[in-house]
Amino acid sequence: SPARSPALSPALRSSRCGGERRGNASDAGADLGAVQDAQLRSVDLNHIIKLLEDSDSVNLEKEQLKALKKVIKRFESGLPLKDLAQIIEILNLCAEKMNEQEAFTEPLCELIKLCGLPFQKKKLSDEVSYSVAVSKSIAQLGYLMRVPSSQVRIQICKCVVSFYNTELPRKLPSGYQPTSANYKIQMAELGGLAETLVLSLALVENQLTEKLWVLKALQHLSSSGVNCRLMMKAQAASRLCLYLNGVDPSGQLVFRSSEILWNLLENTSKEEVVNQLSSLECVHALKEVFADLLMHGFRHYDRQLRNDLLVIATLLAENPAAPMIESGFTKLLIVLATLTEVKIPNPLVKGLKLTYSYEDFEMKKLLFNLIGVLSKDPCAVQLLSENDVIPALLCYVKPNQKPGFHDWSAAQYEELQLHAIAILASVAPLLVEKYLSCQANTLLLVFLEWCIGQDPFIGQGNSFHGTGGRGNKLAQMRYSLRVLRSVVSLYDDAVNLNLCDQGAISQLLDILKYAANKSKEKEDAILLEIQADILFLLSALCENDIHRKELFSYEGVDILIPFIQMDPKKLHSGLGHSCLLFSALDCLWSCVIGCYMAEDYFLEKQGIFLLLDLLALKQKNLYNIILGILVEFCDNPKTTSHISTWRGEKDQTAANLLIQLWRQEELELGVQRDRYGKIVDMKRPLAGSFQKQQGVIPTPANCPSFAIVEVSENIRAKLYSLLCKLGFESLPGLSAQDFVTLAIIRHYMDFKVGEVWSELCAELKEEFRPVGSDEEALKVISEISEDTGRMVAALQTEVLESQHHQEIQEEEKTYTKIQGIHKQREMISKSWQNFLTRTSNYEALKKAKRLQEKSIEASRSKLKTQNGSVHSTDIKGLGTTVSSSQ
């Protein structure tokens, strides 16, 4: 009746009493339907809340349930944002009543179900206006997981899952529109729902169905980075890992837990997830479920899940704090990695057979990768040795004939082969004795011989390790050389001797020629890397061994020369030319210097000229190594003449180039000089700006001071050594400025000794007070250093004055020369004017003729000759005074 209906508003009741009556039955029915709709539309939520809060609510159970049904009916299309806070309050009141009255379970679940529908808004701004209230309301859903009802908990999880359903309701109340698709998800993030659900896992630990629903909800929530961070606060990773080996015939427990772990790894800090998984309990759980899937998982899905867990295990292996070895997981994985190659029965994998499916192929690659990770853990090295990892990996260092692997395709075998050889480069240096006992050097050299052979082979080049190897054997060559590089770089005498005894130097030179010829056809990063690695191997093998340098000499120098002649433009190509050039220079230093036969051949090939050409490019990163090589080469008496003979652009000499480099170095160091390059600071003429700022820092006796360290940190010491070898007298091609700088270079060692004494004095005065005689001696030493500075400054001034005087003399000579040129030009001009006058002016011509006649008459003899012929001085037809040729 209307009196018992708390859902009706006063306005509706008055309209029913005073409204206009209809005249026929159909109008009355329509009116009754409208009234019922109005009743539903005008549910008084505050009244219902008061009704549920009534202390005598036990007697009002039917009334309360009826009111709740009206609420459910009223909001069957979705909850308006403005009413959401009251609905959640009703939910909480229902949850409280459930403890004593089970009848409230169903309406509570129905109300929770409504929360899964899209919320409704009247205005666009409602989403922002109600955001705080909505986020708190959604958070309350998570808190309702405390209600001890399986039905309620499952419904909450279903509600959360429905947040990700973008399907819109079929009908909406007039004036309302659904909120945006991601609104609920954003509010769930804001309210921290994910963290609450993770904590609720403790409540459903023994209820499999509820647990699976919570995991399903978390699986959806974990697609967001914000939710993943909230979950990590609740230790989600460790909680989920412990569920991995729980009893679940459906397999959903492992699947959903591992899926959430993956999302956590992708969306949060990998280190934080790994740290949470690094407890002994978690590692043991991971090991158990992995072993179970390995031995009993035959479905495609099981193998994929097994591989996912293997990736997580690899991440754990990267963490030194994870008890992988203590749990026995590491040993299981190593045994599994070498199972098909070593074929030694092991109880850990008894009865296991690989099917050569794609998932097993992926697992094999993951296991190889894991060995690479374990090689970085010193504690795992013993396990790698005991389980024959080196022999297993060496099974792949053979020509591509698929020995014993009849079920892998050619492309798969090649990928495994390259991966295994790449991992061998990481493991071999740790197990050198095992490496040598397996004749690994021999296998690698034979394999490299096959790589440059003419056998028909088409590399697939499909994998990461196969880059650049399509249609050739370059990928195999690249990784085999990496293995050799990794063991040779140990500088272990046994390894290097074993290689050289098998003719490695000659074979490496052949491979280098092969790669260099290939590089002429098409340069790429792989070929450049191969060449650089071979040059490094030769450097390491030949260093400090004259006999090996002699084996290298002629053929090696011929190969090195083109590298030093490299086009400078290629150094910045980004392909690796710069690294290749450095490797070539290092090889020159290690394989040529110290062997006179090789040195002389290098000089004969004009190698010194090439080095100076490189130095003249002024590539700062090349200075140290080139200058070092030149200094070492100067021990050969023929070298200095080659250096002195060299000429660069604009006829630049080597001495001028070296002095220019000195000035450039001092400019970068901030050494104080005046505008003419003269010394300014007599006490510390070599000190740069940074050295002066540092001052004198007391250091232990076994630590070099700044003045000593500075020698190796810049090129001035090498430039000084080289100029000492050339001699400071009669250096060609130097200007006055060069001589000013040369005066400093010549006294570099004196200044450096003075710097060391200066540091020594400063350190002594900080802790001791020298006695009179010692103080006097220190004072004399300091004065000697300053006197040297003043002497050099005076010499520099003398050079500059001499240059100035010479310039004045040159200027005077030039001026005199210019005067002579002007005078000569005036005479030529005057002569030309006379010539023009004589040839162009008629009066002048007549005058010239008269003068000519007078001159002729005057020259005649006064005595008349009898019977003599008289010749006329006039020539008929003469019309010019110059020859016809002009």
Residue ranges of predicted features:
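Elongated alpha-helical scaffolds that mediate protein-protein interactions in large eukaryotic proteins
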Residues: 1-288, 295-307, 314-365, 373-395, ...
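Alpha-solenoid helical-repeat scaffold
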Residues: 34, 74-77, 427, 437, ...
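Well-ordered alpha-helical segments within folded domains of soluble proteins
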Residues: 308-311, 365-369, 418-422, 479-485, ...
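Extended cytosolic coiled-coil "rod" domains of large eukaryotic scaffolding/tethering proteins
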Residues: 338, 449, 513, 565, ...
